[in-house]
Amino acid sequence: MIREEIKALIISSLAIALAFSIAMTGGIFGLINTKITNFLLLFAYSLFVISLAFILHELGHRATARKFGCYAEYKMWETGLIIAILLSFFGFVFAAPGAVVIYPRYDLWGRPIPLSKKKSGIISISGAIMNIFLSILFLGLSIIYPLELFNLASKINAWLAIFNLIPFPPLDGFKVFAWDKRIWLIAMISAIFLYFFV
């Protein structure tokens, strides 16, 4: 099971990195005019920054859910990956590579024990918290080593946190907002601050 999950994460990461690389060149027309060496460099960059942000986001959900006694596993959505790559040829990416599927614990009679609103909210916010942490980490690195790579990595992670905290289903922000509006607001303001004002 772990081997399948790792395989799904690797495939998802490669597909997302490819989609972002194509979109960042300007889509199909930009891709035609881009040197193969430049594209490979961009792909390597995307693989590092975007895949790291995506994998740690998903593992944040997974680890928190398992801490609450649930079974959690990342499931790849093949259709979402194909859509992401196809849309990248038009210059933009809508990435829906998959999600961590959570199965609740069962009681002695085999009945599922539903997650409380608080636990569900904590599991949901853990992915965004991971991205906020990475954004701060890369921001610190960009101050010490002023490389565009670190600066952009900080912004990408902040953007992922903002996007996932939007309080509409099926995004994580919906469950966080339902659990605790103050915590949702603090997380959202932190992510927006990192993206726009740093």
What are these regions (language model features)?
Residues 1-198:
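Hydrophobic transmembrane alpha-helices and their immediate loop junctions
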